[in-house]
Amino acid sequence: MENLKKMAGIKAAEFVTDGMVVGLGTGSTAYYFVEEIGRRIKEEGLQIIAVTTSSVTSQQAEGLGIPLKSIDEVDLVDVTVDGADEVDPNFNGIKGGGGALLMEKVVATPTKSYIWVVDESKLVEKLGAFKLPVEVVQYGAEQVFRRFERAGYKPAFRQKDGQRFVTDMKNFIIDLDLGVIENPIEFARELDHIVGIVEHGLFNQMVDKVIVAGKAGVQVLEANK
């Protein structure tokens, strides 16, 4: 599995050229993309500026000597490469398993070419088997949680080291065990209107390419947007 992730990450780096502003994703597959960008800077003299989607990725990039700016210091991002937890045939996806969904979506929004790197196990017919992360402000988080309980969404506060997980933006994450999301577009709209929710892990019709590594090799799927 790790080898498949590495293959996808290295393939994605082929879409990066000199002079670009590059969004560096978060997670186990995006990790290999960041490593490859670091190698190209060191060995090939690749010249880019990068923005990151989490404190973890920032630390990785700094260790590799990748020059960084904040998202507010750039107007547009040429290409962002990130992982995904599930991708359906309509190129809707669930992200946020690593807890960085808000920053990931902030960086994805001004990106010209948004690419996901996944192994073939992440391709699904319908979203929802992977728990959907919902980032909520700490104030009133129990109110949102109880609302989800009443709706039958089987919510659970994400935990880390025996305490509630806190995101880089100092929010909580509630994971929803939905099983199947029949209409991701409609469900995203519902979540967007709930006060206290900062962001959710449904990334619908945002991605331009999905790089999939499998037993047969690496393929690049083009989204029909």
From Swiss-Prot:
GO terms for biological process: pentose-phosphate shunt, non-oxidative branch. Keywords: Isomerase. Disulfide bonds: none annotated. InterPro entries: NagB/RpiA_transferase-like, Ribose-5P_isomerase, Ribose5P_isomerase_typA_subgr, Ribose5P_isomerase_type_A. Substrate binds at residues 26-29, 82-85, 95-98, 122. It comes from the Bacteria. One of its GO terms (molecular function) is ribose-5-phosphate isomerase activity. Pathway: Carbohydrate degradation; pentose phosphate pathway; D-ribose 5-phosphate from D-ribulose 5-phosphate (non-oxidative stage): step 1/1. Coiled coil: none annotated. It catalyses: aldehydo-D-ribose 5-phosphate = D-ribulose 5-phosphate. Pfam families: Rib_5-P_isom_A. The keyword Isomerase applies. Gene3D superfamilies: 3.30.70.260, 3.40.50.1360. It is an enzyme of class 5 (isomerase). SUPFAM superfamilies: D-ribose-5-phosphate isomerase (RpiA), lid domain, NagB/RpiA/CoA transferase-like. CDD domains: RPI_A. NCBIfam families: PRK00702.1 (NF001924), rpiA (TIGR00021). Belongs to the ribose 5-phosphate isomerase family. HAMAP family: Rib_5P_isom_A. Homodimer. This is Ribose-5-phosphate isomerase A.
